[in-house]
Amino acid sequence: MQKTLVALISLLLLCSTSQAMARKSAEGKNVYGWVENTTLMPWGVKLKAKLDSGALTSSLHATDVKVFERNGEKWVRFTVDVEDLATGEKVSQTFEKPRYRKVLIRGAGGEDRRPVVLMQLCMGDTVYEEQFTLNDRSDMIYPVLLGRRTLSHLGYLDVTETFLHDPTCTATSPLKLDKDQEDDKDIDD
């Protein structure tokens, strides 16, 4: 009985070790599951994100989205109301960001024009500045959707896995800016 228990524990440890090693590809790139935890920076709120290769641009749950002018430039004011996974509390923050661009989203429900802003999120131990459309996702399970543009910056997607990385960013974590990252050549607006 004791030998069986030791063998079972050894097998479980071996499986968990191989799982941890599966987080990087042979080329050393990170491998993410189709659902991951992320932290919205610098706010520090931990959220669930769906990694979706069917979407081009990432999307963030936002309400009260208003485009306005500041010093001759287009800006966007919006509110993010979400549950912080770290505390279990509902939290709310209003942001004002320069409008990066605008997109036309086509789907089964018709067409929708949305502003795009740059937001920072922590994935694993790295902070990424990424493009996000702003949309009311309150009827969705995940407040953050990461599309192909962001996925191409992160690494690989394993659709059979979830929660392969936990956000562990600090003030000294590497920051990858949108302007410094190359977009995949076959993704287009």
Residue ranges of predicted features:
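Bacterial N-terminal signal peptides that target proteins for export
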Residues: M1-A7
